[in-house]
Amino acid sequence: MWIGVISLFPEMFRAITEHGVTGRAVKSGLLQIECWNPRDFTHDKHRTVDDRPYGGGPGMLMMVQPLRDAIHAAKQAAGDGAKVIYLSPQGRKLTQAGVTELATNQKLILVAGRYEGIDERVIQTEVDEEWSIGDYVLSGGELPAMTLIDAVSRLVPGVLGDQASAEQDSFTDGLLDHPHYTRPELLDGLAVPEALTSGNHEVIRRWRLKQSLGRTWQRRPELINNLALTDEQESLLAEYVREVRDSVK
């Protein structure tokens, strides 16, 4: 997968190109990340990339020309088929379903804004989609861009050593992940659930599904309400709810 990034701080992306899962993906050639800095497309000695907004108000906006030229350079490097995404709190909220959708693209260009944002005409003429990672304000689009890259790259075949890791992550099936345990089997009086040490794969599968359903019901009930549960899921969730209510009587 190829990802181009437009950012005034391209050095920030070393965090994902040199470390962790994404760093290994870059080193193995499964993921390619290239950055373009709008400052490299300025024509004045101060390398100016911001200007005052029309109509007044606080803050500055990223200038059209350097930003647009940087996007054009990224498009030229990408070739045909690259989707341009602007990271913005006004965009579509990123969910696992959205990550899966974005992962179907072989080429993405991510535009990380700064200051008070970018000129609306750049969005109208250069951007295909706007995406947000949440209803809060950050200093720039770099962290959202890195979040998107990390999430999407996990779905690229071969990036994870075990593809089941991606398939079992929280939200992949609309549910939160189940609890996980490793050695020792007994820690400060707390034991690993018997189901996980039973060696029975079906018992383990049902326990994990039940815990996933229950945890989602307790922590993110709106996710449960949006799902069409199978008969097995409904039965396991009812069992979980009953056990919780019995425990507080």
From Swiss-Prot:
Domain of life: Bacteria
Binding-site residues for S-adenosyl-L-methionine, renumbered to this chain: 113, 133-138
Location(s), subcellular: Cytoplasm
Enzyme type, top EC level: transferase
GO biological process: tRNA N1-guanine methylation
Gene: trmD
Assigned keywords, A-Z: Cytoplasm, Methyltransferase, S-adenosyl-L-methionine, Transferase, tRNA processing
SUPFAM superfamilies xrefs: alpha/beta knot
EC number: 2.1.1.228
Protein name per Swiss-Prot or TrEMBL: tRNA (guanine-N(1)-)-methyltransferase
Record's catalysed reaction(s): guanosine(37) in tRNA + S-adenosyl-L-methionine = N(1)-methylguanosine(37) in tRNA + S-adenosyl-L-homocysteine + H(+)
GO CC entries: cytosol
Subunit-level organization: Homodimer.
Record family assignment: Belongs to the RNA methyltransferase TrmD family.
